[in-house]
Amino acid sequence: PPKDDKKKKDAGKSAKKDKDPVNKSGGKAKKKKWSKGKVRDKLNNLVLFDKATYDKLCKEVPNYKLITPAVVSERLKIRGSLARAALQELLSKGLIKLVSKHRAQVIYTRNTKGGDAPAAGEDA
């Protein structure tokens, strides 16, 4: 009987030894929690011009150094499509100058006082 008792203890020890290396090597890692996504505040941009915004467009925008639909949309709180149309109008009136036209990005600048100087020093 005593010999059997020893064997049982050894069996218990060997089982414990088998479990230990698993815990040392990896162990159970904590499960990654989903982060709460950042909530952006809703942009309530104008779809059509009101008088005040239109006046602001005509006065201030031609003085910006870099004029793009994105910049105008952000500053005047108007939709991007409205900003594009407005800049086309300013261009046709000759208040701003086209720098680069791409299907996705149009860049204008203010009219330089000394005629058409090359617009190389552009702040992007």
From Swiss-Prot:
One of its GO terms (cellular component) is nucleolus. Residues 1-37 are annotated as: Disordered. The modification N6-acetyllysine is found at K42, K51, K59, K65, K93. Gene3D superfamilies: Winged helix-like DNA-binding domain superfamily/Winged helix DNA-binding domain. Pfam families: Ribosomal_S25. GO terms for biological process: ribosomal small subunit biogenesis; rRNA processing. Residues 27-37 have a biased composition (Basic residues). Residues 1-22 have a biased composition (Basic and acidic residues). Keywords: Acetylation, Cytoplasm, Ribonucleoprotein, Ribosomal protein. The modification N6-succinyllysine is found at K51, K93. One of its GO terms (molecular function) is structural constituent of ribosome. It is found in: Cytoplasm. Component of the small ribosomal subunit. Component of the small ribosomal subunit. The ribosome is a large ribonucleoprotein complex responsible for the synthesis of proteins in the cell. Belongs to the eukaryotic ribosomal protein eS25 family. This is Small ribosomal subunit protein eS25. It comes from Oryctolagus cuniculus (Rabbit). The gene is RPS25.
